A protein has these predicted regions:
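Alpha-helical transmembrane segments and their immediate juxtamembrane boundary regions
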Residues: 19-73
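Cytosol-facing regions at membranes
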Residues: 1-29, 44, 69-158
């Protein structure tokens, strides 16, 4: 891989991890709010406890099994590592050492949802000043909106 290809991949991985981190954090926050909302409903005796109770249990199980908060934190750490590599890539003496750093970071990558791949590509190409070629599907547009992909990302090399 050339240095430009590695640079593109690093920025793409940063974008993907950042989108995944943001989306999973927002999902975790929505589920937490739903837990509090349903819990208040049970406490002040609004609605049927036989409906609110299983709702609380279901959301708690969902949060525990899918671990959105943990996934968000791990993806955030990984996105910071990708951004650091992108901003310090000029310090690597050769393409080979940069590629080795790239592959070592790649081993810890999150298993991001496939609906975020398209928005990550668009973010990467936009950050590099290119015009995205393929349009996003409706689902990808929704995921991009929910994960904050509509905001511009930094692409400077300090």
């Amino acid at each position: 891989m050339s240095k430009d290809e590695i640079s593109y991949q690093i920025l793409y991985r940063y974008s993907l991890e950042k989108l995944y981190s943001t989306l999973t954090r927002r999902v975790d926050n929505v589920l937490s709010f739903a837990l509090v909302f349903l819990g208040v409903g049970v406490t002040i005796n609004v609605g049927s406890p036989f409906i609110l109770g299983p709702g609380i249990v279901g959301i708690a199980i969902l949060k525990r099994v899918l671990r959105f908060g943990t996934r968000s934190a791990q993806a955030d750490r990984q996105s910071r590592a990708w951004l650091k590599l992108f901003n310090t890539q000029h310090r690597f003496p050769s393409d080979k050492t940069l590629f080795l750093a790239f592959t070592s970071l790649e081993q810890d990558a999150s298993e991001a949802w496939s609906m975020l791949i398209g928005p990550a590509i668009v973010m990467t190409e936009s950050a590099l000043g290119k015009t995205p070629i393929e349009p996003l599907t409706a689902g990808e547009k929704l995921c991009a909106f929910l994960s904050g992909a509509t905001k511009s990302q930094p692409a400077d090399r300090n």
